[in-house]
Amino acid sequence: MAIDVYWGSGSPYAWRVLLALEYKRLPYRSHLLQFSKQEHKSPPMLALNPRGRVPVLKDGDYVCFESLAVLYYLDLKYPKPHIFGSTPEEGGVIMRVICEYQAYIEPHLMNIVRAIFDKSPQTRGANPLRADQITADMHAVASEARTIEARLSKSDWVVGETFSAVDMVIFPGIQLLRRALERPEARELSSRFMPVEVNYPALGRWLARVESLPGYDRTYPPHWRAAAAPSAAETGQKPA
């Protein structure tokens, strides 16, 4: 029985799950939901996930949501290839680095992304990118990116010698940040991070390495291909 995955274009959390499914070469049915139409909050979706967020994975009668929970489930149910390590020690390091990313990078990264993409009436016409908080967020991201850069200067992947859950967690966030910093209004802010290939060469090589994985194109946000900047409604959901 095929796995059903419900996701939205541009959601870094849904992207994690798609990367895992492709890496494990698991057959799945893709259900792309439109954030602009609030399809993720429709009655059928709320029946699967009362929080109305993506990703949601349905495997037979079993329903799983929250992206890390989905990755963990997939690795237990379909263990080859492992994405949480093949030993307790490897798994411990992978989980530790994921926790570090979620505690020390992701909140700052998402603050920046939302400030750039936010088109709400309350902030339209303002310049939130010059706020002290956003500057501090960018400083924090740049500092932590150097930690990831140091890891990747010693290994092809963030932890160990194989693609793992930690790569799946971090990669979509970095790609979303890059997309946000390409916006003209983010030019001054972006100099602290962009171009990635110059400021963080090992990180840049890692991004290219992930992009070359089999099945990667099927995980790429479809609306990004049109080169249209996403709105807050498309990218602004909280972690799932």
What are these regions (language model features)?
Residues 1-135, 240:
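GST-like domain detector, emphasizing the conserved glutathione-binding G-site
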Residues 29-31, 160, 218-219:
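A local structural micro-motif
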Residues 35-36, 163, 225-226:
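Positions that flank functional sites
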Residues 103-208:
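GST-like fold's C-terminal all-alpha helical module
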Residues 220-240:
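Acidic/histidine-enriched, glycine/proline-rich intrinsically disordered or flexible terminal extensions
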